[in-house]
Amino acid sequence: MIARIWSGESPLWRLLLPLSWLYGLVSGVIRLSYQLGWQKAWRAPVPVVVVGNLTAGGNGKTPVVIWLVEQLQQRGIRVGVVSRGYGGKAERYPLVLDDRTSTALAGDEPVLIHQRTGAPVAVAPLRSDAVKALLSAHDLQMIVTDDGLQHYKLARDREIVVIDGVRRFGNGWWLPAGPMRERASRLQSVDAVIVNGGVARPGEIPMRLRPGMAVNLLTGERRDVSTFTNVVAMAGIGHPPRFFATLESCGVQPVKTVALADHQALSQADVAALVTADQTLLMTEKDAVKCRDFAAANWWYLPVDAIMADERAQRLLADLATLAQR
């Protein structure tokens, strides 16, 4: 229903317009208060790069963060990541992740980023606290913040916005009548716009998500995903249909698809009930980090990598590497 409202297919968005106007007013006043100096942002002693979005829902932001961190690491840059840690509930903040930190404490995306990149990661409701904790524990040249474009309490040196190239901005209205957190004109003030799928417009960096080999959660075995049959597909991400479409593009026709809420906590009983012994459960890598401690032999996940071959992506990386080495 929400997807139909935000896309403009359902007329119910009109009923939510008063709340959207209020949301837009409040968000605009908050940003203006920082621009005019009424509120002060905390500035880190190292450059901060924000990877965020203008809309609610999955846009492919986490794969971009992983891509960015890995590319900077290949250039010799010591980079750390901070996040709000949605879906996690630690006893105290800030929380600096280690290899044993669970998604129940830190949230699924921070754990995934840490496992994929090996980069230092910290979470806290106040992102400046997470930055301070990282810098106290590690000698870093740059901080990447996963989400937080609208978290103006943390000063930033570069802003990168990720857009779903198919859905873009839906009906264009602020939450809750539409998907917008800020007006589309905000793109004019950011340093780079990355478009996930669809068709990139002039000045935007096109990106696609390339699926890898399916990985068994229990054994680590890798297999071509197209060899699977009798598949149940599970996705607890911002936009589950994207994962299901990816499977179909790989030649997989699931007998059942299960769309879960983003950051939803998962239990062994709940997940096991989705699949029979003769079926294969295929899930996203983001879901897999929540299931590793109780995985079964027929549970697999499909990792994806962000691919950006555009020259503008290379210019962005060169700019960030130069910024980190100042």
From Swiss-Prot:
Domain of life: Bacteria
Name this protein carries in UniProt: Tetraacyldisaccharide 4'-kinase
Pathway noted in the entry: Glycolipid biosynthesis; lipid IV(A) biosynthesis; lipid IV(A) from (3R)-3-hydroxytetradecanoyl-[acyl-carrier-protein] and UDP-N-acetyl-alpha-D-glucosamine: step 6/6
GO molecular function, one term: tetraacyldisaccharide 4'-kinase activity
Keyword ATP-binding: yes
Species: Klebsiella pneumoniae subsp. pneumoniae (strain ATCC 700721 / MGH 78578)
Any one Pfam family match given in the protein's UniProt record, by short name: LpxK
Reactions this protein catalyses: a lipid A disaccharide + ATP = a lipid IVA + ADP + H(+)
InterPro entries: LpxK, P-loop_NTPase
Keywords: ATP-binding, Kinase, Lipid A biosynthesis, Lipid biosynthesis, Lipid metabolism, Nucleotide-binding, Transferase
UniProt family annotation: Belongs to the LpxK family.
